[in-house]
């Protein structure tokens, strides 16, 4: 979402995969979905917000979006990420990310 231009993404297998777009919009993304397609327009900056992960990829994407957003972003339901990306937080910290896992 932080980029110039417009991108169109097509999902031919699992239409519900775009559920995370609503969460990206909470962060300020300029995005919309229509069936099997999502259109994302680049913006200069995302804002912090609480967001909820609906699956593995969505969770990882929301964490990465939160890292570049202004302010502090809370990503809920991160257990989805654990199923596919072991040591996700630790790996991001080793790359210099300012991220913390907090128990609910």
Curated annotation (Swiss-Prot):
Its EC number is 2.5.1.7. Keywords: Cell cycle, Cell division, Cell shape, Cell wall biogenesis/degradation, Cytoplasm, Peptidoglycan synthesis, Transferase. One of its GO terms (molecular function) is UDP-N-acetylglucosamine 1-carboxyvinyltransferase activity. GO terms for biological process: cell division; cell wall organization; peptidoglycan biosynthetic process; regulation of cell shape. Pathway: Cell wall biogenesis; peptidoglycan biosynthesis. InterPro entries: Enolpyruvate_Tfrase_dom, Enolpyruvate_Tfrase_sf, MurA_subfamily, RNA3'P_cycl/enolpyr_Trfase_a/b. It is an enzyme of class 2 (transferase). It is found in: Cytoplasm. GO terms for cellular component: cytoplasm. It catalyses: phosphoenolpyruvate + UDP-N-acetyl-alpha-D-glucosamine = UDP-N-acetyl-3-O-(1-carboxyvinyl)-alpha-D-glucosamine + phosphate. UDP-N-acetyl-alpha-D-glucosamine binds at residue 13. Cell wall formation. Adds enolpyruvyl to UDP-N-acetylglucosamine. Belongs to the EPSP synthase family. MurA subfamily. This is UDP-N-acetylglucosamine 1-carboxyvinyltransferase. It comes from Mycolicibacterium smegmatis.
């Amino acid at each position: 979402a932080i980029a110039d231009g417009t991108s169109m993404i097509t999902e031919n297998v699992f239409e519900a995969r775009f559920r995370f777009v609503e969460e990206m919009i909470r962060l300020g993304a300029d995005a919309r979905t229509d069936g099997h397609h999502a259109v994302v327009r680049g913006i200069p900056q995302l804002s912090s917000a609480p967001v909820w992960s609906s699956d593995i990829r969505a969770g990882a994407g929301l964490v990465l979006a939160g890292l570049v957003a202004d302010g502090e972003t809370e990503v809920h339901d991160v257990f989805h990420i654990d199923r596919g990306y072991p040591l996700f937080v630790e790996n991001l910290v080793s790359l210099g990310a300012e991220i913390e896992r907090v128990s609910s």
